[in-house]
Amino acid sequence: SPGAAHADRGANTAALRALARIVTFNPAGDTLGVTQGFFVEANGTLIAPYAPFRGATRALVSDSRSRQGHVLRIVAANAELDLLRATTDLARRNDEYLPLSPEQFPVGTAFTLVPFAADGRPAAQMANVVQTESLHGHNYYTLSAANAAALAGLPLLTAEAKPRVAAIAQFNYGKAPSDGTPLGLCALAASAADTLRTNAVAALSPDLTALRIPLLLPTDESEAYTYLYMLLRSRRDSSIVATALADFLAAHPNHREATLDAARFYAARRNYLRADSLLARALRISPDADSRSRVHEERAGLIIDALVVDSLHLPPHWRTAEALRALDRADSLAPHPSSALLRGVILYGQGRNREAFTAFERVNRSDAASLRSFFFAAQALSRAGGNDSAVVALLDSALAHTPTPFTAEAAAPLAWRAVYAERLGDQRRAVLDLVDYERLVPAAELAAPFFLRRAALAEQARLYRRAVDDYTTAAARTADRETRIEALTPKALLCVRLSAGDEALAAAEELQRLTPDTPDALKLLGLSHQLLGHRAQARRYLSQAAAKGDANAAELLRKVK
């Protein structure tokens, strides 16, 4: 009837007003993709295909009235569903957006498809559901409408006076039937688009990580901060994080932790004046002396970090003296062990070792005592000329504050304790510490000198099997001739002392190849053969060594029967 036809035209016109054309751009400003979608909220939120947004840094939007705007924030995205929800700056009137239907429609349902029309008038098409499948709990339809990439992203409408979006058109990538029947267009139930909501877990989504347009934070403050926290620790695209920080602080200006996060973020990117401004803001919004103390301590830490990586480009006031003044202010408000630890690190870096030791000892007397604080104290006391036994006691405490079996952070204290154990004459302790040390560091970092040193200590400690093994490893870890000789000579001699004839002979033969017919090599060959009962070879090699002037070989020769 004329009335029904008029109603259909009105519905189609409303649908057309909700459509959006979208152009995405890469970082160089080149067009990355062109697609279409539709508005679903009065604030300009739209639904569109995901694929054209992958890698895009910005997107332009235009509607059926040729008004232009920008995609502002990505709300949520799902690459598998090829759907994305985003906000724009094109606010809509009540007749310029479409509600989503939660329903799953059966085979035979008729939808209306309203694409853009060249003359601005709606050109509606009918599309019947000919097949349904399930995709993550949502109907996935095959339609009677012809398959066309140009239709992807368009809404399929319910047959109602005030139509709702029943499904979103998607290109059918399947194979055409063998009987020549053309492929029908596909569509995903609109209920899938309604699941695209921002939440804290989404911050780690690889689908969102692949997008470079800023992300919309959750409205709840706690959930939004969790989202921001995860972005700060997972995102490499600093522009995304900077926008998220700005959005969060605009919505929650008195959030102290986020303000400190922002200060750290900008300090790490060498924007020190911005970091200082944020730290000053954090001070203003800190509710008590303890939290203000933490801000001063944070500033000191940022200054020291910056001095390490960017000392040539810092503001004049970002210097070590200012960091110490910040710690003074922190301590005057509420002293913390962490502040004392940082003070000790700064003083140690200045060569003020006694003062550094005092600061570290303050930490060690607190519940915050740790491997680091005791190890730092040991280093400071050592540089200050402290007693060796006192240094070892601190190293013992450091290692007592690490889990057993030891983890990688115990490697440095173990190496230090081995040095002091050797100095104090406790070679056995030194060897055991170096055995633990070897387990904690990558094999590539352990060269021949390490094993030579441990072998010599093991020999002094009468840990002979360890010594032989370490001499063997030292020889295997180097191509340098002199180092191999340095390892094989004591190995062969020790094996002779241990009556390990086969090992002694193998080492002596390798030594002979490296230093042909030298007295040491010849003598060790003779002794090795003597151990194995090879009297003729023993006499021959010892005779050759004696002939070359080795008096000890001559004496040994007289004992060979």
What are these regions (language model features)?
Residues G3-F39, T45-P49, R58, L216, ...:
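N-terminal activation segment of mature serine protease catalytic domains
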Residues D8-N12, A167-L232:
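C-terminal cap/linker of serine protease catalytic domains
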Residues E41-A123, H136-Y140, A149:
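Conserved active-site neighborhood of the chymotrypsin/trypsin-like protease fold
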Residues E257, S291-R294, H336-S338, R372, ...:
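Start-of-helix register in tetratricopeptide repeats
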